[in-house]
Amino acid sequence: KARQLKTSILRKLGRKEEALALVAESLQIDRFNMGCRFEHYLLTRDVKVLEEMKELMRGWAHGYIEYALDFAAAGLYEEALSLLECHVTGTTEIYPVVYYAMGYFHTCKGDESKALEYYQRAEKENHSYCFPNRIEEVLILQDALRLNIHGAKAAYSLGNFWYANRQYDNAIACWEHSAAINPAYPTVWRNLSLAYYNKRDDKQKALETLEKAYALDEHDSRILMELDQLYKRLGRPHSERLAFLEAHLPEVEQRDDLSIERITLYNQSGRYAEAKELIAARNFHPWEGGEGKITGQYVLCRVELAKIALSEKRYADALVLLDETDACPFNL
């Protein structure tokens, strides 16, 4: 970072040869000093230099943001913008913080109308995996909210930052603000539900917001899983939970955890033969934290069916069922 800054200063002073020498020396030490590589391009305007830098950067938005922040920290907003523009050019799906950062750099330059334009662009990008984690991004997103009163996604993203950093009241305030601007975004309601339940012990609000999230996107199998888990924690009757899951079978069948919950509910309802059939019909994939869940249901349904067989004096059937509990089949 210091070498990039010194190179920038030399370039600004018109001492091009010294700047180029420092770039060469710096790249001998660290070939991945992208700040110096970009300075090399600014000094020479050699497209090959730029293309080599872009190849090494692999289109990784976070790398571009990091080096752009280095330039911006020195007041080199034009250079920061130019670097991010290199990433944007030719990229089809832009990580939203790239546009938010470009907007903020325009604010720092005193051009708030241009800043607003970039903030509005950022709102249109996919925020599914937008999780800001730099302290500078707080200032960036706060400025986006200041200039763009319709910035629902900026509020949502800032809430993600606050929640990850245990500032739960700030996170909830941001998500509530986001939901007020755009009540049609399911993920913000889902996030609010988790915060209400886990951080405020407000079970009613948690239920209302998660049901709203699922109503907005009934094809989201993850939200379905979380809603069923909430129903479970709140003591929803087995019959209601099972009916709810079976009303959304395509989504249930996308996930092992939901499929296991359905099987468990069959066993808990005494429908052991149906549970046994469902277990045999699916290939399960154990996950961390889920060890033993499906194998437990596999054993349970057979033991209970064996008890029924014994009560009906079908001793051979009972022995077959109990023998099957000695080892689990490969589909589990």
Residue ranges and their predicted role:
Residues 8, 42, 69, 104, ...:
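Residue-level recognition of tetratricopeptide repeat
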Residues 11, 72, 107, 163, ...:
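Position-specific recognition of the canonical hydrophobic site in helix A of tetratricopeptide repeat
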Residues 19, 80, 115, 137, ...:
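Single-residue signature of alpha-solenoid repeat helices
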Residues 24-28, 55, 86-90, 123-124, ...:
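Conserved structural position within tetratricopeptide repeats
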Residues 31, 58-59, 92-93, 127, ...:
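Short coil turns that delineate tetratricopeptide repeat
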